[in-house]
């Protein structure tokens, strides 16, 4: 594939992105800081959901939350304690600046964005080494705890690596295919863990990342950023980016949760 064949992106990013197998795009609906600090409007539609898959039932993913800004879906996230949400770092940036906590509302407890329990955010904490698609995780501390129920429940963090070939479940809201209609309902799909070497070759990132593949026209898409990948009721990944386009044959990049457990626990203890 030549650069001319790829979706156009900021010129400042091309030198870095040419090192990998395809052009990477964050999965949020906001404009992101690209490698080198340049900004560009991604050539993708605003709004997205898991490509393919099925509509979730109430209580099926009690850890899943949505992040709203201006009453519009921005990203997903996972409840890991009653007052803490784990999401992607690029979900909490506007250009090079971290967005105010007051601009984010977290919705939990329903597969419908029109329902559920809403909580204001007290504190936004992106990983201090986030950049160039690396360390793409952030914590949100809620102003008030979320009540525990059959529909709202924190998920455990995976503390060990996930074997290649394992099947995970990914979930999120938005469009079911590139350019398709937006849904108000949470969707989920299955994906397969890629071997670490294959992940590195596809992304150019050697640490802190886990890659998943799905059949063509399945997988994560813009708007699913920050959302979970789970295995055996444990959170194993945080949605970060896609390569080339939604539902492509290329692997999707997720932050590897086991690599960030120490950072997560240390950060939460500080507040």
UniProtKB/Swiss-Prot annotation:
UniProt xrefs under CDD domains: Tryp_SPc (cd00190)
Tissue: Highest level of adult expression is in the thorax.
Induction: Expression levels are not increased after blood feeding or cold shock, septic wounding, bacterial injection, laminarin injection or CM-Sephadex bead injection.
Enzyme Commission code(s) on record: 3.4.21.-
Disulfide bridge positions per record: 75-91, 199-211, 221-246
SUPFAM superfamilies assigned: Trypsin-like serine proteases (SSF50494)
Signal peptide positions on this chain: 1-22
Keyword field: Disulfide bond, Hydrolase, Protease, Serine protease, Signal, Zymogen
GO molecular function annotations of the record: serine-type endopeptidase activity
Protein name per Swiss-Prot or TrEMBL: Serine protease SP24D
């Amino acid at each position: 594939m030549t650069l001319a064949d790829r979706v156009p992106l900021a010129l400042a990013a091309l030198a870095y992105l040419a090192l990998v197998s395809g052009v990477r795009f964050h999965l949020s609906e906001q404009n992101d800081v690209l490698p080198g600090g340049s900004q560009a409007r991604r050539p993708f539609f605003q709004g997205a959901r898991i490509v393919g898959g099925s509509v979730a039932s109430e209580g099926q993913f009690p850890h899943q939350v949505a992040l709203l800004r201006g009453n519009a879906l921005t990203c997903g996230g996972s409840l890991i304690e009653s007052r803490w949400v784990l999401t992607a770092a690029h979900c909490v940036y506007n250009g090079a600046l971290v967005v105010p906590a007051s601009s984010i509302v977290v919705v939990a407890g329903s597969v419908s964005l029109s329902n559920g329990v809403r909580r204001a955010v007290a504190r936004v904490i992106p990983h201090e080494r986030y950049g160039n698609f690396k360390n793409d995780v952030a914590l949100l501390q809620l102003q008030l705890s979320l009540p525990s129920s059959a529909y709202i429940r924190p998920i455990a963090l995976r503390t060990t690596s996930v074997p290649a070939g394992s099947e995970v479940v990914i979930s999120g809201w938005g469009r079911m295919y590139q350019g398709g209609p937006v849904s108000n309902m949470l969707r989920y799909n299955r994906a397969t863990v890629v071997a670490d070497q294959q992940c590195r070759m596809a992304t150019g990132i050697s640490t802190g990342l886990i890659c998943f593949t799905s059949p063509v026209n399945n997988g994560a898409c813009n708007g699913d950023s920050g959302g979970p990948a789970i295995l055996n009721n444990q959170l194993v990944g945080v949605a970060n980016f896609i390569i080339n386009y939604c539902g492509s044959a290329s692997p999707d990049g997720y932050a590897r949760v086991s690599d960030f457990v120490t950072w997560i626990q240390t950060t939460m203890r500080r507040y």
